Each structure stands twice: as structure tokens, then as C-alpha cells.
């Protein structure tokens, strides 16, 4: 799970739009 969170954080950090989508979920 920690690895997934790290990957998600890395992606969200690069793509602000993705971060919003993740927050919505």
C-alpha cells in the first residue's frame, strides 16, 4: 500500500489535474 501511495503522490505532484481527480475519489 505504501508503494501505491508513493506512486500516486508522484503522479499527483506532476499532474495537478490528476490530484483533483484523486481528491474527488
From Swiss-Prot:
Keywords: Ribonucleoprotein, Ribosomal protein. GO terms for cellular component: ribonucleoprotein complex; ribosome. Belongs to the universal ribosomal protein uL30 family. Part of the 50S ribosomal subunit. This is Large ribosomal subunit protein uL30. It comes from Pseudomonas fluorescens biotype A. The lineage of its organism: Bacteria, Pseudomonadati, Pseudomonadota, Gammaproteobacteria, Pseudomonadales. The gene is rpmD.
